[in-house]
Amino acid sequence: MNNEHAEVMEMHMPTEKIVGQTDLYSIKSSTVRTPDAMPRPIRVKAREVNVFYGSKQALFDVSIDVPERAVTAFIGPSGCGKSTFLRCFNRMNDTIEGSKVTGRIELDGADIYDGSIDVVELRARIGMVFQKPNPFPKSIYENVAYGPRIHGLASAKGDLDRIVETSLQKAGLWNEVKDRLHEPGTGLSGGQQQRLCIARAIAVSPEVILMDEPCSALDPIATAKVEELIDELRENYTIVIVTHSMQQAARVSQRTAMFHLGYLVEEGPTDKMFTNPEEKRTQDYITGRFG
Amino acid sequence: MNSLIVATLLLILIGFAYQVGWSRSRQVAPAGGRLHSRPNYHGARVAIWALVPALLILGLWAFFSDAASRAFVMAQLPSDVRAMGGSELAQALSRIEQIATGFGVVGEPAPYESAAGQALREFRNLAFALVVAAAAGTGALGLYLARRRIAPRLRARDEVERVVRYLLIACSVVAILTTIGIVASLLTEALRFFTFVSPIDFFFGTVWNPRFSTVGAGTGEYGLLPLLWGTVMIASIAMLVSLPIGLMTAVYLTQYARPNIRNAVKPVVEVLAGIPTIVYGFFALVTVGPFLAGIGDLVGLDIRATSALTAGIVMGIMIIPFISSLSDDIIRQVPRAMRDGSLGLGATQSETIRRVILPAALPGIVGAFLLAVSRAIGETMIVVLAAGNSPYLRLNPGEPVSTVTVTIVNQLTGDTDFASPQSLVAFALGLTLFLMTLILNVVALFIVRRYREQYE
């Protein structure tokens, strides 16, 4: 930590005892499943990652381990770099003009920024769900079939049908749309669209799914459905989710990382982060003192 | 001179009325209370009330002054001159007019002419003074009445807003009326043409041979099809050239080019749109035509220097910036989220463009295409110079053709008698052209509008 951060900490330093903590805990304990007891193998490993947009540095020396088949949540106030960091994992920052990433990010031990890595293949292994539901202006079926088609995952028409069906089932959308697969995906409700986007991501059988504030454009009921889905998906996928909502992080994640001003403040098991964080800034943010 | 005086008087009237309204509203403002409208609205309201009646009087005079002067002159003329009638009377009237305006006439004016001219001049001066006085009087009356109504609760702001709205409506009506006027004149003249030639012969005839009216009697043959075919062929060639090039330019500029390249390339492409079409025309005639003919020689094809191919290719080049800048706007309207969604699934950039961006932009691109087609159909200068002006039904694009626009030019240049079918056919052709572009524009607008709704 440098001086700048010490200052920020001072600014937000609470002098009295923490309030609101019990409320938060009650929300969490009522909805979340039992957290993992066993440590899981590491799937994605980031070391000293820096991101620059032009001359402006957005992320400073972030190192983190993402465990397999668990949900890791990135929290922090707006502009703290959590989305930027997430977009490093599937190299979506490459599409932004003037961006530069330094450091190492390993997927199963291989550096994804190495010259020999094929970005197309990487993005097939690390899927992404965006902040706003962004179905293509095509039918529901075509939306899900898009990925398998471009990657040649289905050789026969029947295979494609099967992939579409299982993906929609895994995304919990099958029963709602099975009778109208050929209607436009843009005609669905916001929550359904977001689950369609999740189905679209699942259809290419990724190993890791990145979610960039997937519920920020949804109402509470649709949010609850998507959260339920995320909880189910972690049986099979490694999930990294960026969220503004601390309750959401508490509800769906097993590990939480707190970002502030481009730095990783603290990272650890979600339970511990929300009940007994080491850093004052985490505590302040979680209890709603800033951000 | 007179109009300058009137304009000055009107400006003074407006300024004075505004001032009166403004200060009166301050006077009537209750102590400590508030006016409904701010003083500048009261000022504007009084100015409008003063200006409108004055303008009405002036407008009426402008409308009736000619008829009034004529009636006055006729009353001055000796009865034998009045009885002449026809062109002699008209000539006498115009001589008198010239004497009255001080322009002078050829030869010695007859005594009655001088007298009438003198009288007319006096009449006009008097009438002008009267009209200006009447305008000033009604303006002052309007001002007075408007001022009297000023009260704290008077809704001057609403009145002014209403007038502003009428003013805006009036302006847009001008454009609509002009269109209606053009269509009406096209229609009436075209109908006159159809009294000479039956519409069936015109629309379905395959021979175009109007013969010049000076050559002799006989109306000739007016088959539209050879011209329509030439138009369609050249427009098709133009679109074949411009659509792929324009679209790919737009894709490159929006998806691939870095900002500094984009900033350099885009203006250069748009310079193409600023080149006058006549310049394209002689570019086609002098450079492209002979070049194509030379290539034809090399490969053993008979391509003429002035042909549908030459005109079509050059017209296509002219339309490239039109297509590329319209498509550019449309492609940029496709949300970035679409692109990211596709890239995030591991699609390559060209897959993303082909499978997501272009399909999403397709309705807009079709709209742009149709607008470009209607431009190609209406284009004149390039085809006049480079298409060869040969109105025969020919399938080979290497042969010269003629188009609807070229034929209109041919029929209306030189000595024309607007009562002959040779000239009147131009209006029927113009009407055909107008209907074609109208339909294309309506379809294009319809498609573009549906596209806009998609992302809102």
Curated annotation (Swiss-Prot), chain A:
GO molecular-function terms, A-Z: ATP binding; ATP hydrolysis activity; ATPase-coupled phosphate ion transmembrane transporter activity
Localization, UniProt: Cell inner membrane
Gene from which this protein is expressed: pstB
This protein's record includes keyword Cell inner membrane: yes
EC number: 7.3.2.1
Binding sites annotated in the UniProt record for ATP: 76-83
Assembly and binders: The complex is composed of two ATP-binding proteins (PstB), two transmembrane proteins (PstC and PstA) and a solute-binding protein (PstS).
Function: Part of the ABC transporter complex PstSACB involved in phosphate import. Responsible for energy coupling to the transport system.
PROSITE patterns on file: ABC_TRANSPORTER_1, ABC_TRANSPORTER_2, PSTB
Superkingdom of source: Bacteria
InterPro entries: AAA+_ATPase, ABC_transporter-like_ATP-bd, ABC_transporter-like_CS, P-loop_NTPase, PstB-like
Keyword list, A-Z: ATP-binding, Cell inner membrane, Cell membrane, Membrane, Nucleotide-binding, Phosphate transport, Translocase, Transport
Protein name, as recorded: Phosphate import ATP-binding protein PstB
Residues annotated as domain ABC transporter: 44-286
Residues annotated as signal peptide: none
Main localisation: membrane
Membrane topology: Peripheral membrane protein
SUPFAM superfamilies (alphabetical): P-loop containing nucleoside triphosphate hydrolases
Protein family: Belongs to the ABC transporter superfamily. Phosphate importer (TC 3.A.1.7) family.
GO BP terms: phosphate ion transmembrane transport
Catalysis: reaction(s): phosphate(out) + ATP + H2O = ADP + 2 phosphate(in) + H(+)
GO cellular component, as recorded: plasma membrane
